[in-house]
Amino acid sequence: MENIFDAKAFLSRVTSQPGVYRMYDASGTVIYVGKAKDLKKRLSSYFRAQVNSRKTEALVKCIANIDVTVTHTETEALLLEHSYIQRYQPRYNVLLRDDKSYPYIYLSADKHPRLASYRGAKHAKGEYFGPFPNSLAVRETLALMQKLFPIRQCEDSVYRNRSRPCLQYQIGRCLAPCVKGYVSDEEYAQQVNYVRLFLSGDDSQVIEGLIKRMEEASQALRFEEAARIRDQIHAVRQVTEKQFVANIGDDLDVISVAFNGAIACVYVLFFRQGKVLGSRSYFPKVPANTSLDEVVQTFIGQFYLQGSAIRTLPTEILLDFNLEDKTILAESISSIAGRKIHIQTKPRGDRARYLKLARTNAATALATKQVEQSTISQRYNSLMSLLEMKEIKRMECFDISHTMGEQTVASCVVFDMNGPLKSEYRRYNISGITPGDDYAAMNQVLTRRYGKSLEESKIPDIIFIDGGKGQLAQAIDVFQSLDVDWDKSHPKLIGVAKGSDRKAGLETLFFKPEGEGVALPSDSPALHLIQHIRDESHRHAITGHRQRRAKVKNTSSLESIEGVGPKRRQMLLKYMGGLQALRDASVEEIAKVPTISTALAEKIFNALKH
């Protein structure tokens, strides 16, 4: 379509103040967001006779309208720009795809505080330690904390309703503050303080405190207690000796980038309280013909300005590249943090060594990603050749999971040229069908998925159905009956039947519900891609089915007991801390739950035991 945007008329009325601009295509979709110190000067650069960037040329051809928002300062413009990028996800902007909040270790503010993994806005009262690069690092640290400092990690509902210590106490991983007489409040508070000091990086103070207590116990002839504290000191020392301690006191993020013109890897190394907390590699979505300067400028802005409320900002940010808006960016991040944050680009000494480490890891991560992308690209090309298709932008796959027809769940997974799009995975609880009728289940999920308006970008090129001719026939019937405003004939429907022994490599592809299928060679890249998407769909369906089955299982055994309605079921599970705790409880313990008489407690006890 010919571009009808009147750039000359638009530029004649644009202000020269700082601000943010949004560019729209003919469909009204925001395709690019930018900021400028001088809006008129910046926007004029897009419409010059000679444009240096091929990306800019492609962008300008798509422009149908431009909106501008004037701001008081460049800092305001920067913050607004990244807010718009996050909201609209424009296709010509560099996008940070992994925008999950970082996990923290949370120490609650209860009388007997608990340790837990936490992700999200910090609304709950307590202390937060981190951020950690991933949930695995948090789980490993929590497991270590249990061995070093045995404070509780159980949910409050379990803690409030214990009448005797749990298994964690028996194996020395908890002091059992839930039951009176096992640990004093003072002793528990002391262990909590050790946790606080240890997670804050003050290992020496922890060891000094433990040594003092060990000596006091020894002098008082409490040799068993002294030996236990001695073992705790040894365990803490073993851990701290293995940790790499940096020669810095403040929090520091070290960032390097590796870029090959198509794929960018931004590697972030986190230092907290002078220790290497971990690292993380990011692969932002980079539009074609994007410069390295734009990649790093946009990444840093999105990384620190978006979601800053749930991220602990460092005192200093060390970069392996020059940043055009370094001063403005530092001011913006500092205003959010409420304290001065420095951005450095030319370090010396130890900091230069950390930057070299980040640079090496960025290059390694990029090389690994390139190999993965090459494999994915090879598989896509093989599949396109097999199906005689010019391009495949989007594929979806469906699977059904149930146990003897109960708690049926259907899954839909989505793949694009880069592999799985996990943010677009969906599960569907299936109801109103004959138990075990997989055809009816497939009919229902496909109707729910496609029997509505779809954006053009959401229409799949291929839909894989996990099943043979019957399931494929069901899918074809559904699509023939659809009454929708998009081209329902566009998706290619393919049935994927497992081999006789359900072994990988023996799959048969069906393109029609009648006739013979096609069996690909076991070393076919196209087959490997199909197996990948089919296995993902299967995994996603089974996980959803197990969750649904577990939810039903947790209440079904109570539903059959006369006199126990929904409110009493909820009350029992809440006060006892779950179904397993209720099963383990005595009649007397069950009778302590509000509204539960002794007679009803006996009935519940007998029903759960038998």
Swiss-Prot record:
UniProt entry tagged with the keyword DNA damage: yes
SMART domains (UniProt xref): GIYc (SM00465), HhH1 (SM00278)
Domain annotation GIY-YIG: ranges: 16-94
Keywords: Cytoplasm, DNA damage, DNA excision, DNA repair, Excision nuclease, SOS response
Complexes and interactors: Interacts with UvrB in an incision complex.
Family named by the database record: Belongs to the UvrC family.
Protein name as annotated: UvrABC system protein C
